[in-house]
Swiss-Prot record:
Keyword set, alphabetical order: Cell membrane, Membrane, Nodulation, Plasmid, Transmembrane, Transmembrane helix, Transport
Protein name (Swiss-Prot/TrEMBL): Uncharacterized protein y4nM
TM annotation in the entry: 183-203, 261-281, 308-328, 329-349, 356-376, 379-399, 430-450, 461-481, 492-512
A single Gene Ontology CC term: plasma membrane
Key word Transport present: yes
């Protein structure tokens, strides 16, 4: 009522500002927030807290992680498990766990669930991990985390899931239990439990369980940004490097041909899908290492925001769409794109750890983008452009390696993680990088001086000499920043965010326009 005194628990200022109805709304919001903290004090402390693993204690699925880990790191041993695939899920889980056991310290745990378990333990409540994952995985996890009174997983012919899990729980805890789970398979268990904790996707069953008379508590869902996560996972920002596919259109003076531009645009999109698929493959293969990395652990798959299975399925769809579109556009284009895919995978799994060969491969990968633009439009192969591109991008790749070597040296590290270089190799990366940069400039100058087609294609070719001058200044700047350890990004990414680079690029573009 207006003018009525505030309740004892209502601050006078809030009561004045919001009134009785506003205060009730604030109280309801506060209670909802309190429920999000999740308090189990309403349940008898004699009731143990039973926690599921996949999707509940961790954000991912341990079976899928085990499968992909074995596929990328122990493929031969994975093939030996094929007979177990026909013996049921428990046999498959056991066989995979023997091939490559999941590293418990690398799993994406739900912090809210860990906090709930800690608070339950401090309140004197027993806690158990009961999962359909293999028993060895359950044992490893509770050994790593601590805070559990025991663990039970699948073994032999027993797949501890849904009603089989319920049967085991009722036999082991006849006086009742509180169950924390996340999926439809947990419904029979929740309905028979003394209390239900809904986690992740399990929150959608809240109303159904309340109608069934089950005492329900929910963990507040973490803020999700699926579109942002997928754009980040697909590295859409890296598609900027694929703009090189348009370079032959401008150098071949066919940028005003609508059909050529349209065809190249479709090629750009198809190739972008293939490139994004390779990033997903790389993330799936390096999952354990990424989770141990200071920044890579925040990637969508590593953090569990995108499941490994969804990542794999997206990869298959993008590869099929990208290669299929490439085949429709031009068979030679599809062939070059396939070579790029094979070379990228070889680089990701092995070649990036081989000193000097790694930067040569990077130079080749960038050059293949230009080759795609040539074959897609039936343009003649240019050894000048090919040679310049290889040397130019080898220099940029070495600039990145140089920064890594310099930083490792200044931090007095003995090795550079994931690379074939040592900190003391920085004079080598500096020398080779500057030599490659100089070679690219010399190639450009020789092309302008000796290639007859220059005078045929351009009315004022003298303006073109601005290009090697601008590229030379830009490369010198890149190497200066690299040696000072001020180059914090990939040189291409750096250029896209650098005003000086844009100015030099605009100057070179203007020179080409004047030359026409």
């Amino acid at each position: 009522m207006p003018g009525s005194p505030p309740p004892e628990n209502a601050p006078a200022v809030l009561w004045t500002c919001f009134g009785a109805s506003g205060w009730r709304m604030l109280l309801m919001k506060q209670r909802r927030n309190e429920m999000k903290v999740l308090d189990l004090d309403c349940f008898d402390r004699k009731l143990p807290l039973i926690c599921d693993l996949d999707g509940t204690l961790i954000k991912s699925d341990s079976l899928h992680e085990n499968l992909f880990d074995a596929f990328f790191h122990s493929p031969q041993q994975l093939l030996r498990t094929i007979p177990n695939w026909f013996k049921g899920r428990p046999a498959l889980k056991e066989a995979l766990a023997k091939v490559r056991s999941v590293e418990p310290q690398a799993l994406p745990y739900r912090e809210q669930m860990l906090d709930l378990i800690r608070r339950a333990r401090s309140a004197g409540r027993e806690t158990y991990l009961v999962t359909a994952a293999d028993q060895s995985i359950a044992d490893d996890i509770i050994s790593h985390l601590g805070g559990f009174d025991g663990a039970k997983g699948s073994s032999g012919s027993l797949n501890l899931k849904s009603r089989r899990k319920l049967q085991w729980l009722q036999e082991s805890f006849p006086e009742g239990f509180i169950y924390a789970g996340d999926s439809a398979a947990d419904l029979p268990i929740w309905e028979a439990a003394s209390g239900a904790v809904l986690v992740g996707d399990g929150v959608k069953f809240e109303s159904k369980l309340r109608e069934a008379g089950v005492e329900v508590r929910t963990l507040s869902p973490e803020k999700s940004h699926p579109v942002k996560d997928w754009l980040s996972e697909l590295r859409i920002h890296q598609w900027s490097k694929n703009v090189l596919i348009f370079v032959p259109l401008f150098l071949g003076r066919i940028a005003d041909d609508f059909h050529a531009v349209l065809k190249t645009t479709f090629g750009f999109l198809a190739f972008g899908l293939i490139v994004s698929a390779t990033y997903i493959i790389n993330d799936l293969a390096d999952l354990e290492a990424d989770r141990a990395h200071a920044t890579k652990r925040f990637r969508a798959i590593a953090a569990g925001r995108i499941s490994v299975m969804n990542g794999f399925l997206a990869c298959l769809v993008m590869l099929a769409t990208g290669i299929g579109t490439a085949l429709l556009l031009d068979h030679q284009f599809a062939l070059v794109a396939s070579v790029y895919l094979a070379l990228t995978l070889a680089y990701s799994f092995r070649l990036k750890r081989v000193a000097l060969l790694d930067v040569t491969v990077i130079g080749a990968l960038f050059t293949l983008r230009i080759v795609m633009g040539q074959v897609l439009n039936g343009l003649a192969f240019s050894p000048w452009l090919f040679s310049f591109s290889v040397m130019f991008f080898i220099s940029l790749a070495l600039a990145k390696r140089h920064v890594e070597a310099m930083r490792a040296c200044s931090n007095r590290k003995d090795t550079i993680e994931g690379r074939g270089y040592l900190p003391g190799d920085w004079p080598l990366t500096l020398g080779h990088g500057l030599a490659s940069a100089s070679a690219s400039i010399v190639i450009m100058l020789l092309f302008l001086a000796l290639e007859p087609r220059v005078t045929h294609l351009y009315h004022n070719p003298a303006w073109l000499y601005v290009a090697p001058l601008g590229v030379s200044i830009w490369l010198q700047r890149i190497w200066l920043l690299s040696h000072r350890m001020e180059l914090h990004d990939d040189p291409i990414v750096f250029a896209l965010n650098d005003k000086t680079s844009w100015f030099i690029g605009a100057l070179i573009a203007s020179a080409f326009v004047m030359a026409m």
